[in-house]
Amino acid sequence: MPAPGAPLSRTSRLLLLLLFKVSVSAALSFVPEPRNGTCLGESCSPLIPRRSRDAGGPRNSARDALRVHVPREKLEAEVRGATSWDLPPPRGGDTGVIEEAAASGPLGPPTKPPGAWRWKGAQGKEPSGHLGRREPTDSQLFRQTSERGEMSSKRDEIPQGSQEHSVKTEPEPRDLFYWPRKTGQLQGSHYRPSAVHEGRTLAPPGRALPQNGSADDWVPDQGGPRRGNSTNRRVRLKNPFYPLTQESYGAYAVMCLSVVIFGTGIIGNLAVMCIVCHNYYMRSISNSLLANLAFWDFLIIFFCLPLVIFHELTKKWLLEDFSCKIVPYIEVASLGVTTFTLCALCIDRFRAATNVQMYYEMIENCSSTTAKLAVIWVGALLLALPEVVLRQLSKEDLGFSGQAPAERCVIKISPDLPDTIYVLALTYDGARLWWYFGCYFCLPTLFTITCSLVTARKIRKAEKASTRGNKRQIHLESQMNCTVVALTILYGFCIIPENICNIVTAYMATGVSQQTMDLLNIISQFLLFFKSCVTPVLLFCLCRPFSRAFMECCCCCCEECIQKSSTVTSDDNDNEYTTELELSPFSTIRREMSTFASVGTHC
């Protein structure tokens, strides 16, 4: 028979077991499960399945029963090993703090979709004194990227002066994750390029890039020599006249000499062209050739002389590459025109000396004269065309701060030319020295001297067998022959330095200094201008018809000259026209002189 207190003791034991079971179950409900890296929101929290079991009734009782028998030490180890999502681990490593943090609220990020309100709540939970560096999620990267874009747009709106003060150097509490910016930007640096400069080369402080964006050729902001191909910088040209030095005296001498050549050449060549064009009785084939020569001399002096003098004084071409190409082209074309004109004059004088009466009775029409001039022009322009291809503008630094580099027009073939033109340019460059010497020096001098000697012999024979009426014409032919020889000697004397310069450049360039080459070049240039200036003066001195017409042209505006010329008788006028026309008494033009005299003018 059981004792009377046995049921009571059994009941108390059952109650103790039940109480122990309930306490263990309550402790297991707070144990966090290992967090899955792929879950988001409250689904990662162990409270959700626990609450679902409490609401829906007991489920998985077998697993719950197994958890009852798990030792307490293992449960505490799992609690210690579980990492918190929102709160950082305490420095002291106290397990009680971990349990309080786990029991105080749900673990992991909120379950609501990411948005501005969600991250504002997250910002308030993060302490300001510690920053955790861990791998962010996609939503966190999206938020930080959007915030960076907003900050860059705001920074563009802020002025440059206040932008540097607004850049933060330390992270704020609202930043979830903080790491250094992109490569090339140091942490805490105040230098933040704006979005408008992306993809461009930025110069370091104190330097300014040239306009083409090249980082190699930098241009300093202030002071120092300027380099690079910037078009905004202002370069000072050298003043050749101040201060007074040996170079400035040379510049004054060059300037005075060029003014004399310019004035004399312009007036003389214009006078020759006006005399031939405005006087009908001066329109012979020989005078037309001389007028053509005067036109090219005028072109050389009017166009090339100022450019060459400007380059000599400032070491800079006024029109840069255009003047570097066009000035040598016009000069070589002028040499060709002079060469062919002298040859044509020699042939014309030889025909006149062979049969004087027949020559002066023959009249050449305008088309014949134009055809001869066209042959001279086309031949000279075509032969000078390779000079345009060979000439290149070269710049050399003088070594002075703020001064423009010296520009030189050198013979250099560009590799960008087409293959055919490039081969022709190479061939011409190899044969240029002897072509220049043979065509522009030997041909006019030898041919003219030979023809002049033959013409002089013909004139002597004609003078012995001539009648009284032809002696005046033979004397005029002798004057014209001497004029052609004088023009040839002047031309040969002025072209010799150019050939010497070419020979020195081709064979002795290494042993001659650049200063000597520049001196030879400027001497050859001035002798070419001197030839163009002296040619009309030589015509007025040696050719009587030109001198008489020039004096009449100069005195045509004077009333005394006009009144004096009106008192001359008609016979004297006929003799004057006969002399100027170089006509014989048997010429048919003499009978028509009264008709053409009223058409022509003396100026």
From Swiss-Prot:
Residues 51-79, 145-158, 165-175 have a biased composition (Basic and acidic residues). Its main location: other. It is found in: Cell projection, Dendrite; Synapse; Cell membrane; Endoplasmic reticulum membrane. GO terms for molecular function: G protein-coupled peptide receptor activity; heat shock protein binding; Hsp70 protein binding; neuropeptide binding; neuropeptide receptor activity; PDZ domain binding; peptide binding; prosaposin receptor activity. SUPFAM superfamilies: Family A G protein-coupled receptor-like. Keywords: Cell membrane, Cell projection, Disulfide bond, Endoplasmic reticulum, G-protein coupled receptor, Glycoprotein, Membrane, Receptor, Signal, Synapse, Transducer, Transmembrane, Transmembrane helix, Ubl conjugation. Residues 27-255, 311-325, 391-433, 505-521 are extracellular. Residues 277-289, 347-369, 455-483, 543-603 are cytoplasmic. Highly expressed in the brain. High levels of expression were seen in fiber tracts such as the corpus callosum, anterior commissure, fornix, internal capsule, cerebral peduncles, and stria terminalis. Additionally, moderate levels of expression were seen in the pyramidal tracts and cerebellar peduncles, as well as in the spinal tract of the trigeminal nerve and the spinal fasciculi. Belongs to the G-protein coupled receptor 1 family. The N-terminus is cleaved by ADAM10 metalloproteinase; mediating limited proteolysis leading to the release of receptor ectodomain by shedding. In addition, cleaved by FURIN between Arg-53 and Asp-54. Ubiquitinated by PRKN in the presence of UBE2E1 and UBE2L3 in the endoplasmic reticulum. The unfolded form is specifically ubiquitinated by SYVN1, which promotes its proteasomal degradation and prevents neuronal cell death. Pfam families: 7tm_1. The gene is Gpr37. This is Prosaposin receptor GPR37. The keyword Nucleus does not apply. Residues 1-26 form the signal peptide. Disulfide bonds join C324-C409. It is a multi-pass membrane protein. G-protein-coupled receptor that plays a role in several physiological pathways such as resolution of inflammatory pain and oligodendrocyte differentiation. Acts as a receptor for several ligands including prosaposin, osteocalcin or neuroprotectin D1. Ligand binding induces endocytosis, followed by an ERK phosphorylation cascade. Acts as a receptor for osteocalcin (OCN) to regulate oligodendrocyte differentiation and central nervous system myelination. It comes from Rattus norvegicus. GO terms for biological process: adenylate cyclase-inhibiting G protein-coupled receptor signaling pathway; cellular response to reactive oxygen species; dendrite development; dopamine biosynthetic process; locomotion involved in locomotory behavior; neuropeptide signaling pathway; positive regulation of dopamine metabolic process; positive regulation of MAPK cascade. Residues 39-232 are annotated as: Disordered. Forms a complex with PRKN, STUB1 and HSP70. The amount of STUB1 in the complex increases during ER stress. STUB1 promotes the dissociation of HSP70 from PRKN, thus facilitating PRKN-mediated GPR37 ubiquitination. Interacts with PACRG. The record marks R53, D54, E164, H165 as: Cleavage. Glycans are attached at N36, N212, N229. GO terms for cellular component: cell surface; cytoplasm; dendrite; endoplasmic reticulum; endoplasmic reticulum membrane; plasma membrane; receptor complex; synapse.
